[in-house]
């Protein structure tokens, strides 16, 4: 209906909607469509109103098909209203018709809200711990109809609509209801099937239509380059992992063997045509491989949905959605279940520090800096050109904390390795003077991020016993892996970046120069027990021109392999949990790239297959000898035997655990074959050589001690074993 300029519209008949309100519905500018659309009382009768574009006639019916009345078309664009034979407000449907045929539309505006006052209360308080069941898109049965409930936080928006193929991406069709107290918009849309792409159409407070937004809580997404969210069923996995989860819930992980295989799921292996494997294909190949290799856990680089392959998943736009690259979310649940059935844990890299600025993502979500800081000195990360979460907003903290809980509950993951913690903790991280905003005390500590991390860890450990949190924290921030009640951040473990840096620097030097850098290998023991450490040889060390681990080693090819074998033995004997990035277990020469599989053909060569066997046997030895793992995080599990033999670049120490056999670890980091080398041992008698990285089966020269050494008490009271030290090798000797 149009009104001539200068004239007021004709008044609507009693019970009928005024023309300006109809125009507002048709233009998508009505402030509250739920107040006018659907079924409403009109005196002692009821009237129904609907917007059905393309319809010429509309008949209102009950959900069971009983006719309630024919509605009048008030506007040719498809606005209908009229009296209906009802005694109360209830859900109804419409039978619409035009020259092309007939179709049925269930009226979303005839349904009441789904969220309740208790949801509002906990959301306002910031303490809602099941947002993942309330926000986003969930299949429900509501007032007799099947459909999807949508809910999204956009407190500063003038309008939010759900758009998708079910409404021809028309933002006027499913405008959501605003819950004013929380800023959450919601709507129940009947008849939307599983697997339907959708987004949110948002009009900001100034009336500007924003780029379509993906659902922050979406549990499934389209495959890139498409960016829509997708409706998804709840995960219906038949979990068979009770024994696995009970084990980790009942033990102290610091005293368990933990050897982690770090994997980029898109490039571990590929199909012959170069395509990525699905979760089911990965399960068939990766799980048996890890069992054979003796790893206790698989840690995946981020698998949350991300648009840009070279980001490796660290710039995620869908924290709640397993990436579509490997199939549906149920495939990941099956993968985790398969791991747990054979005793393998699954850890996810998790990125709560920052998010990309893709227009369909979180940045300026409702036309304001909602998830990020408005001030670029706080809200923009100069290293990665990404936005930084505003940890001072309780809604943002709840979004992130709930995401951590979501992966633990819905997918049974065993741990989260939190990425880029240092960038969260320091307000001046990668910033020059004047480019950052001090905290309330004038310091550079991000106190809001500290509180977030403490809250996240407290919630995870409080609700999901047995789930680990691991910090990638590259500075000396104190008490990262100490309990929150003791002033710590509350993580279970922390990556030991210092160990990785110092030892790789040492191994890159020619052996003749190593005596001048002996402290690179001993310094770490000064702080080795200040945190619960994981020793990480991660993906970060084999990219961006750094070369693979084998390429970093000094010397010719024989020395490179011997150096790396000795280094692995050194590391597996060193206190701390272990982490090794894929491909390094067989000494891949090429630097890792995310767009191709590993060079598995190298296993046809003895040196590479020998390296793989060594890592397998190191894992087996580490897991079977409590002395090597039961006191990884406690100083009483380590004792130096030889710490100062700079001239020979020899290191030796004792690993021990209460009531268990002692293990001595001896490393020779020169290519010199040393006979008659004396090492002190605490107990006289026979010590078995349980591992020798120079063994021929590993590609070494086969030098050693014939399977055992003997320690004797000498006249001066010392107990000494005279042993043979193979060149560039590590020995492990167990008290017999």
UniProtKB/Swiss-Prot annotation:
GO terms for molecular function: 1,4-alpha-glucan branching enzyme activity; cation binding; hydrolase activity, hydrolyzing O-glycosyl compounds. It catalyses: Transfers a segment of a (1->4)-alpha-D-glucan chain to a primary hydroxy group in a similar glucan chain. Pathway: Glycan biosynthesis; glycogen biosynthesis. It comes from the Bacteria. The keyword Glycosyltransferase applies. One of its GO terms (biological process) is glycogen biosynthetic process. InterPro entries: A-amylase/branching_C, Branching_enzy, GlgB, GlgB_N, GlgB_N_E_set_prok, Glyco_hydro_13_cat_dom, Glyco_hydro_13_N, Glyco_hydro_b. Monomer. NCBIfam families: branching_enzym (TIGR01515), PRK05402.1 (NF003811), PRK12313.1 (NF008967). Catalyzes the formation of the alpha-1,6-glucosidic linkages in glycogen by scission of a 1,4-alpha-linked oligosaccharide from growing alpha-1,4-glucan chains and the subsequent attachment of the oligosaccharide to the alpha-1,6 position. This is 1,4-alpha-glucan branching enzyme GlgB. It comes from Rhizobium meliloti (strain 1021) (Ensifer meliloti). The gene is glgB.
């Amino acid at each position: 209906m149009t009104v001539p300029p200068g004239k007021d519209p004709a008044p609507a008949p009693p019970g009928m909607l005024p023309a300006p309100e109809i125009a507002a519905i048709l233009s998508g500018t009505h402030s509250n469509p739920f107040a006018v659309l659907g079924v409403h009382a009109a005196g002692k009768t009821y009237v129904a109103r609907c917007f059905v574009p393309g319809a010429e006639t509309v008949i209102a019916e009950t959900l069971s098909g009983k006719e309630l009345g024919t509605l009048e078309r008030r506007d040719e664009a498809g606005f209908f209203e009229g009296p209906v034979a009802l005694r109360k407000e209830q859900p109804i449907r419409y039978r619409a018709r035009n020259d092309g045929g007939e179709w049925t539309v269930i009226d979303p505006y005839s349904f009441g809200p789904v969220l309740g006052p208790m949801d509002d209360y906990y959301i306002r308080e910031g303490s809602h711990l099941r947002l993942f069941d309330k926000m986003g898109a969930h299949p429900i049965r509501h007032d007799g109809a099947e459909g999807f409930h949508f809910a999204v936080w956009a407190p500063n928006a003038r309008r939010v609509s759900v758009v998708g193929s079910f409404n021809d991406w028309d933002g006027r069709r499913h405008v959501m209801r605003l819950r004013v107290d929380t800023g959450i918009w919601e709507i129940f849309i009947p008849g939307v099937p599983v697997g339907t792409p959708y987004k949110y159409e948002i009009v900001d407070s100034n009336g500007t239509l924003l780029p379509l937004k993906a659902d922050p809580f979406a549990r499934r997404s389209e495959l890139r380059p498409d960016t829509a969210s997708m409706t998804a069923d709840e995960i219906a996995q038949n979990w068979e992992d009770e024994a696995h989860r009970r084990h980790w819930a009942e033990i102290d992980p610091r005293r368990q063997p933990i050897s982690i295989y770090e994997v980029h799921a898109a490039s571990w292996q590929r199909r012959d045509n170069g395509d990525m494997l699905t979760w089911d294909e990965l399960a068939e190949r990766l799980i048996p491989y890890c069992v054979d290799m003796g790893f206790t856990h698989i840690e995946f680089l981020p698998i949350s949905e991300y648009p840009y392959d070279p980001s490796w998943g660290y710039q995620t736009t869908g924290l709640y959605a397993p990436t579509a690259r490997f199939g549906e979310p149920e495939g990941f649940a099956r993968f985790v279940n398969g791991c747990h059935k054979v005793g393998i844990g699954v850890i996810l890299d998790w990125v709560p520090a920052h998010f990309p600025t893709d227009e369909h993502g979180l940045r300026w979500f409702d036309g304001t800096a909602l998830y990020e800081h408005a001030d670029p000195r706080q809200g923009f990360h100069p290293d990665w050109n990404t936005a930084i979460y505003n940890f001072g907003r309780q809604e943002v903290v709840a979004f992130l904390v709930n995401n951590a809980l979501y992966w633990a509950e819905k997918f049974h993951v065993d741990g989260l390795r939190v990425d880029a913690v240092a960038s969260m903790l320091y307000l001046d991280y990668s910033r020059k003077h004047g480019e950052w905003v001090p905290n309330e005390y004038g310091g550079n500590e991000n106190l809001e991020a500290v509180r977030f991390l403490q809250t996240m860890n407290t919630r995870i450990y409080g609700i999901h016993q047995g789930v680990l949190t691991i910090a990638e924290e590259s500075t000396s921030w104190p008490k990262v892996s100490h309990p929150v009640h003791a002033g710590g951040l509350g993580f279970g473990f922390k990556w030991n970046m210092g160990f990785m840096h110092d030892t790789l620097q040492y191994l890159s030097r020619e052996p003749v120069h190593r005596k001048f850098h002996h402290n690179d290998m001993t310094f770490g023991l000064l702080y080795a027990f200040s945190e619960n450490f994981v020793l990480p040889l991660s993906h970060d060390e084999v990219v961006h021109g750094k070369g693979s681990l084998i390429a970093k080693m000094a010397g010719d090819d024989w020395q490179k392999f011997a150096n790396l074998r000795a280094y692995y033995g050194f590391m597996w004997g060193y206190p701390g949990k272990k982490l090794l990035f894929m491909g390094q277990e067989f000494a891949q020469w090429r630097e890792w790239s995310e767009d191709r599989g590993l060079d598995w053909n190298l296993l046809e060569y003895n040196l590479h297959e020998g390296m793989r066997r060594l890592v397998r046997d190191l894992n087996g030895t580490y897991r079977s000898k409590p002395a090597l793992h039961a006191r990884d995080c406690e100083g009483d599990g380590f004792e130096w035997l030889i710490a100062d033999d700079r001239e020979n670049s020899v290191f030796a120490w004792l690993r021990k655990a209460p009531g268990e056999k002692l293990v001595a670890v001896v490393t020779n980091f020169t290519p010199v074959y040393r006979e008659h080398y004396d090492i002190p041992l605490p107990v006289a008698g026979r010590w078995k050589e349980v591992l020798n990285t120079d063994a021929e089966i590993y590609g070494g020269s086969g030098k050693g001690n014939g399977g055992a050494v003997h320690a004797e008490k000498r006249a001066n009271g010392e107990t000494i074993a005279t042993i043979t030290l193979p060149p560039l090798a590590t020995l492990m000797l167990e008290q017999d």
